[in-house]
């Protein structure tokens, strides 16, 4: 396999009082929003103060960090941490959202695309780069989320952002499906990288799978399933099942 196995660092997360709070590592399920996860934990475990440290799109899975109580003060530090993702893009088609949230809107040829062309595209997208966020994103323009404007069909001017992609590996052995592993800075949109790969190889691309495997020192391998966390926490708190 192209990708090296993930290393799991032991964390120092231990049970604490509700006031002190805790850092919760969850594996976000497919189709759930980050706020779905927050609300599930908040209501099921009767937690007053809780927030998440970085949004995951509904069609993405993987590591989601929640902080409760006084630990919510640490959210900013986790949001700013380096992120790692694995996923799959498919060449030859595009969607407005660059993933499967929206229907295909165009098809492109792929016969001309070589391994060398793909590697060159990846190299161009590695390092400190200027990136345009997707129109279907939570970026705010004029006080409103871009995805709301997109769903109304409203045209907006999107400004590029400076982000850092420190690692961009691909496996094109199942072409036109391309598996990838990316390590990047805060604010990087993986869908934008996928879109730009398609453009650079003179075709189109969309993302069919995405999983966040790491946030800073925290790894998906150490995360709990949401229902498992809820059951364990309710038992700790003496709440009825």
Positions of predicted regions on the chain:
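Catalytic/RNA-binding core of pseudouridine synthases
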Residues: 2-241
């Amino acid at each position: 396999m192209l990708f090296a196995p993930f290393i799991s660092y032991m964390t120092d997360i231990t049970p604490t009082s509700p006031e002190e709070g805790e850092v919760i590592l969850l594996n976000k399920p497919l189709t759930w929003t980050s706020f779905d996860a927050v609300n599930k934990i908040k209501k099921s475990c009767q937690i007053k103060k809780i927030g998440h440290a970085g949004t995951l799109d509904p069609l993405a899975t993987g590591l989601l960090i929640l902080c409760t109580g006084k630990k919510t003060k640490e959210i900013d530090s986790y949001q700013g941490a380096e992120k790692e993702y694995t996923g799959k893009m498919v060449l030859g088609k595009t969607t407005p959202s660059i993933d499967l949230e929206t229907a295909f809107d165009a098809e492109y040829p792929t016969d001309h695309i070589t391994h060398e062309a793909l590697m060159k595209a990846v190299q161009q997208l590695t390092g400190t780069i200027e990136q345009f966020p997707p129109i279907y994103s939570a970026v705010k323009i004029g006080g409103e989320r871009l995805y709301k404007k997109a769903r109304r069909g409203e045209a907006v001017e999107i400004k590029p952002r400076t982000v850092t992609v420190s690692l961009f590996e691909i496996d094109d052995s199942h072409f036109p499906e391309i598996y990838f592993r990316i390590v990047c800075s805060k604010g990087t949109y993986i869908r934008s990288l996928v879109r730009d790969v398609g453009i650079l190889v003179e075709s189109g691309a969309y993302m069919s799978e995405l999983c966040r495997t790491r946030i800073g020192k925290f790894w998906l391998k150490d995360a709990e399933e949401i229902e498992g966390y809820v059951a364990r926490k309710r038992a700790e708190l003496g709440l009825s099942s």
